[in-house]
Amino acid sequence: MAPSKWDDEEDSSSPPPPPVVARRKFDDEEEEDVLDSWDAAEDSEVEREKAAKAAAAAAKAEAEAAAKKKSKAQRIEEHKQERKKQAEANESDEDSDEDEAARRARLRRTEKEGDLKHAQDLFDDIDLNRNRGAPKAIVISDSADPTQAVDLSAMPLFKPTTKDQFTRLTTTLIPLLTAHSKKPHYALWAQEFTKQLVKELNSGDVKKIASALTTISNEKMREERAADKGNKKTKAAKTKVSLVASRDNKIDATPYDDDGLDDDDFM
């Protein structure tokens, strides 16, 4: 009997390959691999941080170098643009009912304040307050009662602008100051006071004031010389009168009894 077809197929089929047994990793070997991967990740993170810091430092250095190369006009323009953006940002937060005129006034005021602050930052060696002519507050307080104080700079008398106002200031101060002219330190004080008064004037105005003082000095010298001559004449006249008076009032004490004549000579 011929073998069945099924038997032939079974005989012709090859046996399956043996299973591949994977090598088992030890516990410590697996942990070492994990640690190595962590260390590598940490190293890469540190490198990235270092690279980011280096890039930031380089960008900052470039920005500083570029800023140094910019002129003052460019820096002022940049500040203006920044202030304009800030003002526009603040404008969005303001009340929507603000009218156009008020908004423009506020923007102009903000720009002026910013310009002044920036000018003070750039030219801090210039006394802007003095150039504006704003007087400093001069507060005089009572030593007995410190709460009683007066700001002289706020009084209209000390803020003259016209010729009449300056004349009024002069007529007010002169009597108060010249009342101390007989005191020992008045002359020295007047010299220093005059220097301080003309300190802010130009040389031409100072020369005119010096010429006026020279004229006053010459007039004083003539008055003093005339007074000295008058005193000398008066003194000489008094001396002459006293001599004549003393001569007239002299008593004649000559004895006339002993004249060498006897009474018999007349008989």
Swiss-Prot record:
Under the heading InterPro entries, the entry gives: eIF3-like_dom_sf, eIF3j
- What GO terms are given for molecular function? translation initiation factor activity
- Does the keyword field hold Protein biosynthesis? yes
- Which ranges are annotated Basic and acidic residues under compositional bias? 74-88, 108-121, 220-231
Could you give one GO CC term from the UniProt record?
A: eukaryotic 48S preinitiation complex
- For the region Disordered, give the residue spans: 1-128, 220-241
Tell me where on the tree of life, at the top rank, the source sits: Eukaryota
Name the UniProt key words of this record, in alphabetical order. Answer: Coiled coil, Cytoplasm, Initiation factor, Protein biosynthesis
Question: Gene3D superfamilies from the entry?
Answer: Eukaryotic translation initiation factor 3 like domains
**Annotated Acidic residues bias:** 28-46, 90-100
Task: Enumerate the subcellular locations listed in this protein's record, separating them with semicolons.
Answer: Cytoplasm
GO terms classed as biological process: formation of cytoplasmic translation initiation complex
| Claim: Coiled coil is one of the keywords in the record | yes
Report the coiled-coil segments. 44-96
- Record-stated family: Belongs to the eIF-3 subunit J family.
Q: What does this protein do?
A: Component of the eukaryotic translation initiation factor 3 (eIF-3) complex, which is involved in protein synthesis of a specialized repertoire of mRNAs and, together with other initiation factors, stimulates binding of mRNA and methionyl-tRNAi to the 40S ribosome. The eIF-3 complex specifically targets and initiates translation of a subset of mRNAs involved in cell proliferation.
Q: How does it assemble?
A: Component of the eukaryotic translation initiation factor 3 (eIF-3) complex.
Q: What is this protein called?
A: Eukaryotic translation initiation factor 3 subunit J
Organism of derivation: Neosartorya fischeri (strain ATCC 1020 / DSM 3700 / CBS 544.65 / FGSC A1164 / JCM 1740 / NRRL 181 / WB 181)
